[in-house]
Amino acid sequence: PDDIDSPNYSSIDVNTYLELIDEQFDIEKLVSVGKDAGCDKAAVLIIAEGKGRSFAIHRTGELDFIGEAVIYEPHNSELQAGVFVHEMLHLFGADDLYHPHQSEENVEFIKEHYPGEVMLSGHAPTESLALSPYTLWRMGWTDEREEWFDAFVTEANQ
């Protein structure tokens, strides 16, 4: 998460989640089974009740095969499927396509041409969710790179 001072930022240390995952699951076995099945990456989804902002964690190092997405569920709320999709897609390379992660011009371009793009927000109605060509390309689901992608690729997300 970007703003630690925000009231939406979770006070729970990210490493706590990683430790809990390692305690609850045989991560080495998960990696082995996934790789044997021909998977490039595995994702773990955590739903935590409480205040916070949903986010994805990219593991680095020896176990970079595993990625985690943490999703906060406020008490008695309905979690939208788009939040799950949005956070999970980060683990496979998708970028946030909203401000401040993108310029206002880029956000407006996506809103105009791909209004259902899930990386704009995970809070859109499920039936309207879609993936833009940029998101498909970032995740490696297509090799077709369009010229307009250049405006979205930054030093931080290369």
Annotate each language-model stretch with its function.
Residues G82-L97:
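Active-site recognition of the HExxH zinc-binding catalytic motif
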